[in-house]
């Protein structure tokens, strides 16, 4: 049990402690999306491909997940004040180094260190926030705030990044983040005294070998999911090696956890069928959430919206997420049946997917995409807190911490899996539609001939020779076919996913055990 009465300076009012804790937890949550917020710019700055940016982001997230399994030991070893000061100082050093790195290898190393550092303060800060909201609804309030900020962070970061790049250089974005960390450092020094949270535990009991094995299998698995399609899967030696490492190290990790006295992850938590159902819902949710990248790619590649304009538009989605989180918290407090919250979320996601299907065309205005774009955020915000609490409900009290770790690990794999599935579906469908449409570009097709003649005449009128004009006409027509193939592929993806979400919505409504499980958790935590 955390003893919080003595770790804060006694002369500080309660509201100041709450405000300080909230401010100190925000930077770690926002930094997760700092480099990925403008992946195109960062990729060009480092001379790498967008897939490389996705890989580095996944590495950061994977290292964060692995570190979550051991961060409690670090928090028990150090006094809270020294622990948080050390984390802030390390973050400042890594951020400063990141501002001057142009080498991909060093960038990857720094991103993995980022993931390690960002995982350390989370558990302590959330537990401290729980103690500042002692009511029976305190957990709902804290979780709702935490996930609201997490879901809205892409919009916040994108807006700040867009403004920074419009006014200054990319490095100023890093300098701004360093400034926030310095302010957080000052607040920590002001809030905490040198007393400890709990009894000190030695670090030699930490399973560092298991941690290294876990990081290795996460890196290998992420590499396969991100680069598999680009490297033609099993035709590439590095993909085969990645799969081999993943299988071997997964076996080693499972064996070690089953035989260890102090496992990083207790596999008994997965015996609950309801917990596995909750994790499955997370996977489906994140696959649907990955479609947001398809929307953003269309905005940039087809509609040619500028980065700053796109950053402003993302506030619509963030508003939906915030609204969903607030509605979910209100419904939980009012004892609303949780399975209907899940069903409503999946139903709203299906509406967004099917609606957006009709928006994949060459010209679209903000007024047309605003409502479905808002609904996507509303769907995700509505389900996040209830689903987390539902997963926690499956764990016995002595395994509760492993319930949260299972949820976090599933979100990591669901993020990578969602990227992999959507990306591969896009490539396959775009290629299929391109081949199909290209077959119509023949000398016997009057529409194709008319289009080519018009384009050729246009280029000739601009001063090109007939030969050059013909080549440019073919290139422009080919670009048009590729754009249409891209849009048609997106339409198919969104249609099929809408059907999947409708099916899961029906299955949720027919399930009789979801509400019973949540009632058990509600009685345990809220006492009613």
List each language-model region with its residue ranges.
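Transmembrane-helix exit segments and adjacent C-terminal regions of multi-pass membrane proteins
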Residues: 2-10, 464-528
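Hydrophobic transmembrane-helix bundles of small-molecule transporters
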Residues: 166-280
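Extracytoplasmic
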Residues: 12-71, 106, 121-122, 292-297
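12-transmembrane solute porter fold
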Residues: 14-31, 35-37, 264-430
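Central cavity-lining transmembrane alpha-helices of secondary-active solute carriers
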Residues: 57-73, 122-127, 315-328
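MFS-fold secondary transporters
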Residues: 94-99, 114, 188, 355-363, ...
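Interfacial helix-cap and linker-helix signal at transmembrane-aqueous boundaries
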Residues: 42-47, 74-75, 160-169, 225, ...
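Helix-loop-helix hairpins in multi-pass membrane proteins, especially solute transporters
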Residues: 70-209
């Amino acid at each position: 049990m955390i003893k919080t009465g003595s770790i804060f300076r006694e002369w500080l009012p309660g509201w100041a402690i709450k405000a300080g804790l909230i401010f100190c937890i925000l930077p770690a949550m926002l930094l997760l999306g700092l480099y990925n917020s403008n992946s195109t710019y960062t990729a060009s700055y480092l001379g790498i491909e967008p897939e490389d940016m996705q890989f580095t982001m996944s590495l950061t997230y994977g290292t964060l997940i692995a570190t979550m399994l051991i961060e409690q030991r670090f928090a028990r070893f150090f006094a809270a004040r020294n622990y948080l000061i050390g984390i802030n100082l390390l973050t400042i050093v890594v951020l400063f180094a990141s501002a001057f790195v142009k080498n991909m290898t060093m960038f990857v190393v720094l991103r993995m260190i980022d993931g390690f550092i960002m995982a350390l303060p989370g558990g302590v800060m959330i537990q401290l926030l729980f103690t500042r909201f002692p009511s029976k609804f305190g957990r709902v309030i804290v979780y709702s705030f935490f996930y609201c900020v997490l879901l809205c962070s892409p919009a916040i970061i994108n807006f700040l990044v867009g403004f920074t790049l419009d006014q200054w250089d990319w490095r100023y974005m890093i300098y701004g983040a360093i400034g926030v960390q310095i302010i957080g450092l000052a607040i920590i020094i002001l809030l905490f005294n040198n007393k400890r949270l709990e009894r000190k535990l030695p670090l030699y009991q930490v399973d560092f070998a298991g941690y290294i094995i876990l990081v290795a299998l996460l890196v290998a698995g992420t590499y396969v999911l991100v680069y598999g399609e680009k490297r033609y899967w099993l035709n590439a030696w590095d993909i085969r090696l990645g799969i081999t490492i993943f299988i071997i190290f997964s076996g080693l990790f499972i064996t070690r956890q089953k035989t260890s006295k102090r496992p990083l992850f207790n596999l008994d938590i997965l015996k609950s069928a309801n917990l596995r159902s909750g994790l499955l819902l997370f996977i489906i949710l994140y696959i649907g959430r990955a479609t947001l990248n398809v929307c953003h790619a269309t905005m940039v590649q087809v509609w040619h919206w500028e980065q700053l304009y796109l950053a402003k538009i993302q506030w619509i989605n963030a508003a939906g997420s915030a609204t969903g989180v607030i509605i979910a918290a209100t419904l939980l407090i009012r004892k609303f049946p949780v399975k209907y919250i899940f069903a409503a979320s999946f139903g709203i996601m299906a509406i967004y997917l099917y609606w957006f299907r009709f928006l994949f065309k060459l010209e679209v205005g903000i007024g047309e995409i605003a409502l479905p774009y808002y609904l996507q955020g509303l769907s995700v915000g509505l389900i996040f807190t209830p689903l987390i609490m539902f997963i926690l409900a499956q764990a016995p009290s002595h395994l509760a911490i492993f319930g949260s770790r299972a949820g976090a690990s599933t979100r990591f794999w669901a993020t990578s899996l969602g990227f992999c599935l959507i990306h591969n579906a896009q490539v396959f469908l775009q290629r299929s539609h391109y081949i199909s449409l290209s077959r119509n570009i023949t000398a016997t097709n009057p529409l194709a001939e008319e289009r080519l003649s018009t384009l050729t005449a246009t280029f000739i009128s601009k001063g090109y020779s007939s030969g050059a004009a013909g080549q440019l006409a073919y290139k422009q027509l080919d670009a048009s076919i590729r754009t249409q193939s891209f849009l048609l592929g997106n339409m198919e993806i969104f249609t099929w996913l809408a059907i999947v979400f409708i099916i899961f919505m029906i299955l949720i409504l027919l399930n009789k055990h979801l509400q019973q499980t949540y009632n058990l958790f509600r009685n345990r935590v809220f006492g009613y």
